[in-house]
Amino acid sequence: MLAGIGFYRRFISPLIGPRCRFTPTCSAYGLEAIQRHGPWKGGWLTVKRLLRCHPFTPCGCDPVPD
């Protein structure tokens, strides 16, 4: 999972530019969530975050929960 996020950050993100509506960015959120909560819970938190990141959601701070 972490390698997938790293690949996205290194190769895909520079091509499409900044698009995340939240702070921290979705990729940073994913890294932190997986590091803090492990691959299952952290991965699930990341998927939920990605589903919230769309033009109809207000922008703002959305930290990884404890």
UniProtKB/Swiss-Prot annotation:
Superkingdom: Bacteria
GO (cellular component) term, any one: plasma membrane
Bilayer topology annotation: Peripheral membrane protein
Keywords noted in UniProt: Cell inner membrane, Cell membrane, Membrane
Localization per Swiss-Prot or TrEMBL: Cell inner membrane
UniProt xrefs under NCBIfam families: membrane protein insertion efficiency factor YidD
Family: Belongs to the UPF0161 family.
Task of the protein: Could be involved in insertion of integral membrane proteins into the membrane.
Name the record gives this protein: Putative membrane protein insertion efficiency factor
Organism: Parasynechococcus marenigrum (strain WH8102)
Lineage: Bacteria, Bacillati, Cyanobacteriota, Cyanophyceae, Synechococcales
